[in-house]
């Protein structure tokens, strides 16, 4: 499927968990520029009340779609020590980039046993976040880059906005390092325009049972188990659509769906997303066909659910 310039821009914006303000501003600008061309113009909720999250309410919602805007990365500790944010792959020599009060940073990841360091020649401010250096590669079959998780989930949610008439589209934060924004977002949604079902627009993994070019992944379970009745309904609808899909059953992993399940609200949820190879590395790889089926499934389900 065609990859637009805004996705490429998103991939270049750092947003390590807890530092999502820049990507949120870019996303908000994109929404304001595009919304007049969408089938329905949403009500937009953002600002300090929502930290760096953005909520779009279209019409009379029945379903909410959640896509997290943060990424994994690293944080500078003391001297030249690093600690991970989320679960990045620890590959010695990986190039890391960032910025502190002294200026731009480009360095390499040094791994010594369980200890992590950078090799930048000067001191870096404590608490500085470092991201994988970005290299976007696109051919006729694949997109490969750092942070496809979850820039592609955000991209799919934005594509959904073009045709959506009734529903919530919500851009969340903190997900890669344990979550935290979902409780106040769910509370606001249920107080403003209540829904009983949620879809998680995120990226999952290529495994022995999930493969490139075989369609979007519907997750029956990861570490957490959504309600079978709702998952069965999702599967039945997607079967009727004719859109390619595959089913995932895993013992590990999690998403914003966890916080839906642990919330005080009786909401069903399902994780639906394309699968990537080389997870949480600078070289994440996703099939363009699978991304296309992801976009199609969300547009279909938001009409049918």
Model regions: which residues?
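N-terminal hydrophobic/helix-forming segments and targeting peptides
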Residues: 1-305
């Amino acid at each position: 499927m065609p990859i637009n310039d805004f996705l490429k821009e998103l991939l270049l914006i750092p947003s390590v968990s807890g530092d999502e303000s820049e990507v949120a501003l870019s996303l908000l600008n994109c929404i304001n520029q595009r919304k007049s061309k969408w089938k329905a113009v949403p009500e937009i909720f953002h600002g300090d009340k929502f930290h760096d999250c953005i909520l779009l309410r279209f019409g009379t919602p029945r379903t909410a779609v959640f896509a997290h805007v943060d990424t994994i990365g690293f944080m500078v500790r003391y001297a030249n020590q690093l600690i991970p944010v989320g679960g990045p792959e620890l590959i010695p020599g990986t190039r890391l980039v960032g910025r502190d009060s002294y200026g731009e940073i480009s360095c390499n990841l040094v791994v010594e046993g369980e200890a992590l360091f950078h090799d930048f020649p000067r001191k870096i401010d404590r608490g500085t976040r470092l991201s994988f250096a970005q290299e976007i590669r696109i051919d006729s079959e694949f997109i490969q880059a750092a942070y496809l998780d979850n820039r592609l989930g955000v991209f799919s949610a934005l594509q959904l906005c073009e045709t959506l008439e009734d529903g919530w589209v919500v851009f969340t934060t903190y997900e890669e390092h344990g979550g935290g924004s979902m409780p106040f977002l769910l509370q606001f949604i249920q107080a403003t325009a209540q829904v009983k079902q949620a879809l998680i627009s995120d990226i999952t993994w290529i495994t022995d049972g999930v493969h490139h070019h075989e369609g979007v992944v519907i997750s029956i379970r990861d570490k957490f188990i959504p309600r079978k009745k709702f998952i069965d309904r999702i599967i039945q609808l997607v079967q009727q659509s004719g859109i390619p899909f595959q089913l995932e059953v895993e013992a590990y992993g999690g998403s914003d769906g966890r916080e839906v399940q642990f919330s005080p609200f009786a909401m069903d949820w399902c994780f639906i997303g394309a699968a990537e190879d080389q997870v949480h590395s600078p070289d994440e790889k996703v099939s363009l066909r699978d991304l296309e089926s992801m976009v199609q499934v969300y547009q279909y389900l938001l009409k049918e659910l």
